[in-house]
């Protein structure tokens, strides 16, 4: 919630997303939420020396392409990767595709019923310029499907909020009927499914060496 508030109120040009690479599958979840928010970001895969010492392997370039954001192995305690991290930040800020070819905006597919609900809500949300200027309408629709109280309060005063909530509830009911899960769980499962698939495609494997902590 704090991160979301800062991103909305400060509207940074580029976000540096620091990821603890000791447990990528768990720690990439925030990255999927930043993708929903449609922010420009560069990811620091921090503590990368410890993953190497454990014998973990991953194609960082391929992972960057799949997430649509440059990912830079870093070790902040030694300064490793910091210069490259800031070079990527500048490249993303200046839209230099030749220097940061992996940067592109992607959508994570949450399943057809949820995606239909997102599209239907977006048709209404896009009518409000004050919302579009501060938020990704896709992000707002996803948060409504997660029954986020802050976003519900944001939407409630809108002229056609009843229609927006109706689309949300219809999509949630269809998800429940189809999968047996509530829409919040279905969204979380879809995100972790995306992360797992991306790591697999990037050749991620864990080593068999003992932890270095």
Range-by-range predicted roles:
Residues 211-213:
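Structural and coupling elements of P-loop NTPases
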Residues 2-72:
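Conserved C-terminal guanine-recognition region of P-loop GTPase G domains, centered on the G4
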Residues 42, 52-208:
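Alpha-helical transmembrane helix bundles of large polytopic membrane transport and channel proteins
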């Amino acid at each position: 919630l704090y991160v979301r508030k800062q991103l909305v109120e400060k509207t940074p040009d580029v976000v540096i997303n620091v990821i603890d690479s000791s447990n990528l599958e768990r720690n990439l979840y925030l990255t999927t939420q930043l993708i929903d928010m449609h922010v420009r970001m560069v990811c620091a895969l921090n503590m990368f020396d410890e993953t190497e010492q454990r014998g973990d392997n991953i194609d960082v370039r391929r992972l960057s392409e799949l997430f649509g954001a440059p990912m830079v192995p870093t070790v902040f305690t030694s300064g490793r990767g910091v210069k490259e991290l800031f070079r990527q930040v500048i490249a993303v800020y200046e839209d230099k595709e030749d220097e940061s070819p992996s940067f592109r905006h992607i959508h994570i597919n949450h399943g057809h019923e949820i995606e239909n609900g997102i599209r239907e809500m977006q048709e209404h949300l896009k009518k409000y310029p004050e919302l579009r200027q501060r938020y990704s309408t896709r992000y707002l629709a996803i948060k409504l499907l997660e029954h986020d109280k802050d976003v519900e309060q944001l939407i409630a005063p809108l002229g056609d909020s009843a229609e927006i909530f109706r689309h949300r509830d219809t999509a949630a009911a269809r998800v429940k009927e189809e999968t047996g899960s509530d829409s919040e769980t279905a969204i979380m499962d879809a995100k972790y499914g995306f992360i797992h698939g991306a790591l697999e495609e990037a050749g991620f494997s864990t080593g068999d060496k003992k932890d270095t902590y």
